Amino acid sequence: MKIALVQTELVWEDPGANLGHFTELLASEVSSTDTDLVVLPEMFTTGFSMSSAQFAEPMSGDTVSWMKSKSQQGGYAIGGSVMMQERGNFYNRFILCHPDAEIITYDKKHLFRMSTEHDHYSAGARRVGFSLNDFQICPQICYDLRFPVWSRHRGDYDVLLYVANWPSARRSHWLSLLRARAIENQCYVVGVNRVGADKNLSYSGDSIVYDFHGETLLDLKNETCVGHVTLDQLALNDYRQSFPVWKDADNFDFIEDLPD
């Protein structure tokens, strides 16, 4: 599977400018013959904004329409997170649009309280996966990365996909945790971050792809660019069979509410 990672600056709270910028990037840097999946950062139309009441869109809005159009025109799936409004609630939602018009959504589970995200958005309640070119992919968003139980491999995915607005001040955490998720889950890990600065923070990029050994396949460092990587399903399967750590994993389940 061939993936394009889009690492770029974002214009603060300006969806039109950001969609225009991504339109130009996709036209110049992404080929439909060499790409199965395009990954955009977290909140790619606004930056990591708490202005949900002002900028959140319905699923019938301009951003999802743009994603569907680009996916169908380019012949590749495209995914990233956007602030969304649904039934009176706001969500930091990962959206995946497939060329055949299928749409997959995942609402961020762990909201970043240090930026009061939990005061402006509702948390998601379920982990989601989707299939693409025989790969099973589990999308997660930024702060989710710090919670390994939520990403624990249970035989249901081959790729962990993180989209983020992860600040420069904690870049070592980003790189270390992504690599740990790859090793402990024996999977590919794709992390797509932004560069530049917004109203509050600066971002160093560090979009990266680790294989199931924790070895680096692609590192975009702090460049504004589109990076390309190819993932090998056979190599992953062979490794999991030859070194089956998963057979000794502890069993667990999610418990929503414990009795008093």
Regions found by a protein language model. Give the residues of each.
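Extreme N-terminal starter segment of soluble prokaryotic enzymes
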Residues: 1-5
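Short polar catalytic/cofactor-binding loops
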Residues: 7-12
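Structural motif
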Residues: 36-37, 137, 159
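C-terminal beta-strand edge segments of enzyme domains
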Residues: 129, 194-260
